[in-house]
Amino acid sequence: MHLESQAFAEADAGLVGMMGMRGRGMGGMMGGRSNVPNGTPLRVMTLRTRARQGAAFRVPERLSSFDAAWAPRAGAPIRRVPLTFQRMEWLLDGRTFAMGDVAPEETVAAGSTQLWEFENLANPMGMEAAHPIHIHGRQFRVIDRTGGRARNALRAGIVDAGWRDTVLVLPGETVRVQVPFTRHPGLYLYHCHILEHEDMGMMRNFRVT
């Protein structure tokens, strides 16, 4: 836990700055401010229980399994996914989100395995931002990290160990992940998990056929 916390603390250029604005987000760049003062209580929703439900269940003896002998698959196809900022939009592979839109390279065959290479590129505005990239419906393994400013805990592979569904890509970094598309055909999302970035377009569909 300490090492993972250290890794995120070391990523201040990206996570603390969010959009490279040192915590001010797009409001810091635009000069805007929230009209809700910090600490103000907000009613988000009200939940009402209409009937008492039984709570009888058993926890499985084994929740999951882990293959300690796992190794990257040689010869897996590589898909490059640049992470960029243009025209006030965050982009995945040069595209923003469109409902139901799937590019040819975003269509994969069930049972296949691919390497997805996320490259966090500089942009003309000079903004640096970390992107925690989340892939729906799949778990993957981080193969390697190159470029960027070294973060000790990340470089040591501690945070990246094991099966993941989200990977942090720091400014200037290229991170390769191996994704097995083993089952469950359908339409899925992959996106940046920073809400500002996602809402500004950094989300796409992929289809497993």
Model-identified regions with their sequence ranges:
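Extended terminal and domain-junction accessory segments
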Residues: 1-131, 137-140, 180-187, 191-209
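Extracytoplasmic beta-sandwich strand-turn segments characteristic of Greek-key/jelly-roll folds
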Residues: 103-107, 131, 137-185
